[in-house]
């Protein structure tokens, strides 16, 4: 696996993305790429580890830093960082990451995933950012109907039935919108808590649910990107 940084320019200011690439990426890079959006903690070692897992599966993984260098382990500070990030700013960073991934690595098809806050941005980007081919948001908030009505790419939405943030009621809103607008959305819910995929948080991590969700996401990206 190869790792490096990618510089991103946005109207809100410059930032970087952590990049993990397969060892056997030929030429300008792997043709299939995944944009990975971090949780409200920022660009943590856990995010870099996840990028490496995608690279090990043959994808170029680009994880943009939406907080421009800020990280925290404190939930109150994380909440302030998240609520201080305008949707438009985050989407602009994602759009820049998509464009730079195509330019720097020759990526032909690009997917997006994210967790918690990153899941919110991944789903919103699936509706609004050009150049994406598939999305796999984990327990992110649901956009309003105006945004969802623009969704055209397949979405695998991963949820936890015991999630007190992205509750089953919110997930049902997504299901209802998918039916109403005939959207290409599949929802998979596990008997698990919010953030069940994060193996650095033993109080919520669910290894069985995480392993199953991982295989589902890989299947989606292999079908749509590779």
Placement of each model-derived feature along the sequence:
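N-terminal cap/leader regions of alpha/beta-hydrolase-fold enzymes
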Residues: 1-226
């Amino acid at each position: 696996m190869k790792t490096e940084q990618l510089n991103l320019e946005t109207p809100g200011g410059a930032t970087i993305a952590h990049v993990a690439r397969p060892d056997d990426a030929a030429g300008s890079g792997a043709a299939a790429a995944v944009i990975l959006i971090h949780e409200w903690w920022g660009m943590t070692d856990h995010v870099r580890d996840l990028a490496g897992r995608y690279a090990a599966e043959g994808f170029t993984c680009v994880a943009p830093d939406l907080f421009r260098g800020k990280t925290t382990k404190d939930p109150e500070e994380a909440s302030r960082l998240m609520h201080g990030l305008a949707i438009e700013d985050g989407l602009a960073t994602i759009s820049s990451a998509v464009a730079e991934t195509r330019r720097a690595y020759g990526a032909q098809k690009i997917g997006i995933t994210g967790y918690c806050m990153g899941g919110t941005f991944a789903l919103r980007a699936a509706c609004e950012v050009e150049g994406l081919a598939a999305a796999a948001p984990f327990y992110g908030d649901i956009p309003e109907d105006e945004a969802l009505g623009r969704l055209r790419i397949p979405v695998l939405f991963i949820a936890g039935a015991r999630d007190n943030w992205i509750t089953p009621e919110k997930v049902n809103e997504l299901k209802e919108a998918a039916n109403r607008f005939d959207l290409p959305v599949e929802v998979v819910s596990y008997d698990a808590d919010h953030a069940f995929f994060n193996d650095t948080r033993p109080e919520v991590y669910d290894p069985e649910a995480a392993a199953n969700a991982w295989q589902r996401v890989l299947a989606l990206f292999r079908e749509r990107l590779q």
